[in-house]
């Protein structure tokens, strides 16, 4: 197995605490490898026993036991984890205002220490900080604009990766990433494709620098993710990917060699109508109709006979979200796993039960919660939405389409019911069509991504149940250091052929079991600071002192926002109470930043008061409103408050909110009042499908 050489990294980690950690981790990894091989052997034996048996015609030959080779998925996870374990993490998060400063900060990573870097925003930044829990959150001043030319931009990106892999104290002075990897005696684990003309390059550069991967440019026009690539475009893309792998000079043609991961960090179609050939033949017996698509990430990285040579995934989105996806993958240590099963337990559905996988995760000290039966009902789901999900990982079985998902007993929920998240979350979703239009918030998958899912295995079309890896098997693989997205893909059997499950995120992201020793973090003071750094918590204190002196609403708003950025929701909620006491001007200035903390703290009345002060709530604000209050509408007795909720109905599918609000208006003000509300929405709704559902609701209001 190729890894970081002892001389290149162990010698430069001079801190005793990190040396002790590495010694403990070596023992833990050996133990984990033994367990992983045993688990893999058991799965292989179970598969063999399930196959039809032919009676032997001759006496069996003596069995000569050979050492079991390490399966490539476990090799892949161990290689990724070794990089993670050997390079210390600094206990801080750095917030930057723009992409030029982002690249400059990545160039400050070294083999002595790295840290998360986020392009500051008010959704993904505090979400990441709440999960990472750094001792300091630092804000950097801008270093200026990016250079105008693409060549200069590419040079800056490659420089950042080179710096991150230059061995401190070495006489080597690498001028590019390949030379830096060579000087560190390190063999890259994969290839990242990006374009400086596409904003997702922020993920590409971070993943190349963080994992130690080759960065290759993939320019040219591509249609958006919801579209379908034609066969000619796909053949060209497939050839480009393989040519780039070949150009590295590393072995790539089989899983388990050097290059096993391909991450495409740019916007492109997620579906493809593949050419008719053995290279992209669908699973036997599936018989797709002409024009029906498969997943681009499942079709890529295959030899002419259809054999897979790497696991491909994609990352798309703006610069902020793409950086967040990369940093979540590189630095977070998921601990809590929710396993939610809406399926019945007999027949083929029983294979997708989660109890066995949950038991495996608990053995590895994951905080595991299983939901099934009435706990997986629509009512239970809507109750769980209040305040946002706290899970780090969600394994979920459901049925439906791109615009709805069925809970227990086939009660429908909708994209509007996709949970807000307290922490970044990885998702394995068994559900047809969830990612057919992944950039649209009006689909199940699109809403999950918008809300902060950073790793996602899901389907782009109707894949059939057997196309999904059962959650218990995913859990067993993940617990044995198989990367999360790799664990979500079949690597043998009929559904290892080109089909309809796609992967979004970092294919090298592993989830080390909590039973392993935690990696100690370096103090922020252990490395030199950059120019223009300020401590966000200290900024909040200074703004609060200024606010008490001047009474300026803007100072209160600055203090509250900075508290949110440090992940301190409880303190932010307290400051909101102070803002309200200071009068309307201060409350109005603070309200937009207060919504998130009040939602997550489940302070329903305070949230409602803040929401009503915001002239133009965002779509995410609306999601928080309805997720916090849907199950509390029955407690409202004031007709005026219910009428106000009638004005807040989300416009794409009005029947979703109306179906939950109208019965409460009927309860308080009578059937006619409820019908007036629903009729008013029918009159101002133009979408035919939405109007159909409103009419159905109106017919039921008798």
List the model feature ranges, each with a label.
Residues 93-113, 120, 191-211:
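A structural feature that tracks compact, well-ordered secondary-structure segments
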Residues 576-577, 610-611, 645-646, 678:
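Inward-facing hydrophobic residues that define packing positions of alpha-helical scaffold repeats
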Residues 40-54:
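Signal peptide processing junction and immediate N-terminal pro/mature segment
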Residues 28-42:
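Bacterial N-terminal signal peptides
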Residues 549-557, 569, 583-592, 602-608, ...:
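Generic helix N-cap/helix-start motif at coil->alpha-helix transitions
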Residues 125-136, 145-585, 596, 600-601, ...:
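Cysteine-dependent hydrolase recognition
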Residues 52-91, 160-174:
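N-terminal low-complexity, Pro/Thr/Ser-rich intrinsically disordered segments
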Residues 1-26:
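N-terminal secretory signal peptides that target proteins for export/translocation
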């Amino acid at each position: 197995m190729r890894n970081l050489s002892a001389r290149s990294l162990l010698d430069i980690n001079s801190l005793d605490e990190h040396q002790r950690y590495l010694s403990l981790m070596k023992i833990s990894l050996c133990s984990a490898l033994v367990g992983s091989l045993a688990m893999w052997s058991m799965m292989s034996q179970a598969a063999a026993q399930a196959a039809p048996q032919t009676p032997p015609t001759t006496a069996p030959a003596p069995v000569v036991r050979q050492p079991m080779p390490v399966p490539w998925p476990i090799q892949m996870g161990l290689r990724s984890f070794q990089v993670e374990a050997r390079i210390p993490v600094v206990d801080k998060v750095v917030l930057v205002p723009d992409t030029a400063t982002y690249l400059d900060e990545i160039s400050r990573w070294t083999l002595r220490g790295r840290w998360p870097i986020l392009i500051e925003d008010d959704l993904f930044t505090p979400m990441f900080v709440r999960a990472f829990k750094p001792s300091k959150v630092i804000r950097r001043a801008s270093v200026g604009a990016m250079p105008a030319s693409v060549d200069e931009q590419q040079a800056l990106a490659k420089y950042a990766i080179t710096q991150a892999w230059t061995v401190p104290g070495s006489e080597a002075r690498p001028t590019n990433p390949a030379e830096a990897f060579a000087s560190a005696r390190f063999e890259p684990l994969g290839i990242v494709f990006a374009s400086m003309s596409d904003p997702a390059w922020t993920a590409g550069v971070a993943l190349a620098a963080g994992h130690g991967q080759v960065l290759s440019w993939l320019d040219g026009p591509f249609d958006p993710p919801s579209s379908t690539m034609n066969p000619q475009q796909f053949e060209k893309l497939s050839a480009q990917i393989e040519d780039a792998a070949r150009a590295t000079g590393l072995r790539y043609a089989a899983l388990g060699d050097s290059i096993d991961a391909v991450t495409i960090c740019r916007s492109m179609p997620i579906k493809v109508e593949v050419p008719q050939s053995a290279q992209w033949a669908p699973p036997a017996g599936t018989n797709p109709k002409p024009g029906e698509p498969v997943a681009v990430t499942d079709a890529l990285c295959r030899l002419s006979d259809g054999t897979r040579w790497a696991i491909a995934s994609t990352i798309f989105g703006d610069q902020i979200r793409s950086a967040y996806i990369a940093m979540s993958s590189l630095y977070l240590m998921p601990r809590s796993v929710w396993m939610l099963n809406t399926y019945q337990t007999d027949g083929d559905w029983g294979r997708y039960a989660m109890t066995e996988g949950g038991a495996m995760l608990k053995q590895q000290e994951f905080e595991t919660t299983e939901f099934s039966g009435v706990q997986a009902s629509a009512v239970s789901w809507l109750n769980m939405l209040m305040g946002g999900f706290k899970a780090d990982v969600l394994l979920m079985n459901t049925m439906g389409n791109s615009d709805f998902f069925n809970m227990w007993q086939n009660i429908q929920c909708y994209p509007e019911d996709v949970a807000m998240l307290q922490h970044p979350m990885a998702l394995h979703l068994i559900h047809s069509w969830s990612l057919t239009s992944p950039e649209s918030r009006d689909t199940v998958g699109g809403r999950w991504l918008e809300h902060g899912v950073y790793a996602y295995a899901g389907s782009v079309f109707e894949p059939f149940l057997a196309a999904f890896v059962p959650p218990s098997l995913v859990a067993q693989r993940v617990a044995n250091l198989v990367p999360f997205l790799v664990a979500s893909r079949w690597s043998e059997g009929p559904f290892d052929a080109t089909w309809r499950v796609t992967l979004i995120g970092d294919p090298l992201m592993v989830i080390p079991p909590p039973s392993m020793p935690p990696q100690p973090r370096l103090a922020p003071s252990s490395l030199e600071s950059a120019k223009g750094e300020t401590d966000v918590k200290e900024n909040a204190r200074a703004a609060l002192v200024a606010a008490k002196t001047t009474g300026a609403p803007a100072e209160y708003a600055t203090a509250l926002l900075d508290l949110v950025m440090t992940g301190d929701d409880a303190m932010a909620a307290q400051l909101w109470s102070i803002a309200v006491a200071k009068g309307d001007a201060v409350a109005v200035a603070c309200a937009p930043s207060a919504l998130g903390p009040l939602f997550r703290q489940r302070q329903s009345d305070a949230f409602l008061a803040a929401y009503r002060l915001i002239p133009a709530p965002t779509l995410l604000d609306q999601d928080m409103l309805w997720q916090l209050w849907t199950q509390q509408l029955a407690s409202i007795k004031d007709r005026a408050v219910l009428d106000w909720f009638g004005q807040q109905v989300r416009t794409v599918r009005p029947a979703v909110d109306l179906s939950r609000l109208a019965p409460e208006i009927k309860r308080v003000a009578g059937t006619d009042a409820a019908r007036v509300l629903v009729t008013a929405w029918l009159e101002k709704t133009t979408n035919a499908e939405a109007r159909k559902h409103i009419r159905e609701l109106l017919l039921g209001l008798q």
